[in-house]
Regions:
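Short alpha-helical segment of the dimerization/phosphotransfer core of two-component systems
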Residues: 66-74
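Short conserved segment of the HATPase_c
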Residues: 176-190
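Glycine-rich ATP-binding loops of the HATPase_c
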Residues: 217-224
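Short helix-loop "hinge" at the ATP-lid/N-box region of the Bergerat-fold HATPase_c
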Residues: 148-149
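Conserved catalytic submotifs in the C-terminal HATPase_c
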Residues: 94-95, 114, 119-129, 163
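Conserved micro-motifs of the catalytic ATP-binding
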Residues: 86-91, 129-133
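Short beta-strand/loop element within the Bergerat-fold HATPase_c
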Residues: 155-166
Length: 237
């Protein structure tokens, strides 16, 4: 029996090894490609500034700047995701009040919320205390709020529901299915690709949020409260 067990383990390891190596190669490629892209983007940005100084059509310059900004954001997200994949993003933990963190971020993004005609409504407990890394949770909540700002349709309200050990951020959305929600944390997944082109979404934000949660022993889930209402729940495991 022992011999059979050893043989099965060896066969399994051999079968799995190519898959593991392939995943590792893909991760390394993303990391290397992201670093390589940063230099030409910096050159393009400098050239665009030069075109602006030379009196080139403002619409052309502004369009270039928007695309460069979008690419820079994508590269930064890819690098961040790569660091989490490699386990480099772990850090010290402490008691963190997620409600306070969310309110601080809302105050920072208030001009953008006002510009979009959006409101943030807080309900439930005054605090949500969990033991985690504050910087990581700040980034996670920022991603969720940014996602809500981009994709809220209909009722212009982002909801923040606090309980003792969980925080939920919700918004009205285009009609979605449970299958779509089940894929929402997949890398580069887009519920509506045409809408992502207009909002500037890269399809990586929620993947990064999920990776942050996993790295910091926090559970992040997405659920439909109705066909046109989604919420993201941060909770202790």
């Amino acid at each position: 029996i022992l011999v059979v067990y050893v043989l099965v383990r060896l066969a399994s390891n051999r079968a799995i090894r190519p898959f593991v190596e392939n995943v590792e190669r893909q991760r390394q490629f993303v990391s290397n490609a992201s670093h390589e892209i940063k230099t030409p983007l910096a050159v393009l940005s400098a050239n665009t500034d030069l075109l602006a100084m030379m009196g080139t059509d403002a619409k052309f310059v502004d369009s270039n700047k928007r695309q460069i900004k979008r690419l820079n954001s994508l590269v930064e997200q890819m690098l961040l995701l790569s660091r989490y994949d490699e386990g480099e993003a772990t850090a010290t933990k402490e008691e963190v009040d997620l409600v306070a963190v969310t309110k601080d971020i809302v105050e920072e993004i208030l001009p953008v919320l006002n510009e979009k005609g959006l409101q943030v409504e807080f309900t439930g407990e005054a605090q949500t205390i969990i033991t985690t890394n504050k910087s990581a949770m700040t980034e996670l909540i920022r991603i969720l709020l940014d996602n809500a700002m981009k994709y809220t349709v209909g009722k212009p309200v982002i909801t923040v529901e606090a309980k003792r050990n969980q925080l939920a951020i919700g918004n009205a959305t285009e009609p979605m299915t449970k299958e779509q929600v089940s894929q929402i944390f997949d890398r580069f997944y887009r519920v509506d690709s045409s809408r992502n082109r207009t909002t500037g979404g890269s399809g990586l934000g929620l993947s990064i949020a999920q990776k942050i949660a996993e790295t910091n022993d926090v559970q992040l889930t997405a659920e439909l409260t109705s066909e046109t209402q989604i919420r993201f729940v941060i909770a202790t495991k």
